[in-house]
Amino acid sequence: VEELGRRIDLGALLLTSAKPRIFIAGADVEAIATITDRAEAEEASRRVQRLFTAWENLPFPTIAAIRGTAVGGGLEISLASTYIVASDREDVRIGLPEIKLGIVPGWGGCVRLPRRIGIAPALDIILAGKALPAKTAFRLGLVDALLPDASFEHLAIQFAGAKTTTRRNPAKERRGPRSARSLLLERNPLGRSILFSQASKRAVAATRGQ
């Protein structure tokens, strides 16, 4: 990633997967289970956080092109990208299932997802461990463009080409439609306190207090 940051010949970078029906399915669950030391867990998380932050800070637009399952770390690196595009195929799923393992997204997803779609809908995704259809993710503003699968690669390249003169995706483009209730809760201290109290209770319930 550091080497990419020094490239002056790149106008944009498209992140894709060569695997059929899988973008990135996240971390190795068995590898996570072997970590029993808190310091080791924190360092492992920080190591990937540094990588994703470096990706996020590249001096040109990055586009995550999702054409299959993008969960856990797959969504987290997508959130660190400037834009996210996804195939309209029915089996495409996007989400953060970590809560089902008794943990929370540790590579920046808990911060970047609320920035993109708002606190309330982000908490709903994180605390339910939901994997959303691409069309739902697009409707929430999580995905910037929904592309027909038959021409996905061509259209993703076109999308990237159109973004070569921009550095950041404007906030107004990133935010999906939110209800008056969500806006009211997010924009005042009492509302945020209510949201986080509810989030804490849901997290305890989802992990059975573990």
Language-model segment annotations:
Residues 1, 6, 121-123, 133, ...:
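Intrinsically disordered, low-complexity segments enriched in small/flexible residues
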Residues 26, 45, 49, 72, ...:
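Glycine-rich phosphate-binding loop at the start of an alpha helix
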Residues 25, 34, 127, 139, ...:
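Phosphate-coordinating loops and pocket residues in cytosolic domains that bind phosphorylated ligands
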Residues 1-39, 50-67, 87-92:
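A structural preference for short, pocket-lining loop segments at secondary-structure junctions
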Residues 25, 58, 80-81, 141-142:
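Short, structured coil segments at secondary-structure junctions
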Residues 51, 71-126, 140, 156:
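CoA-thioester-processing core
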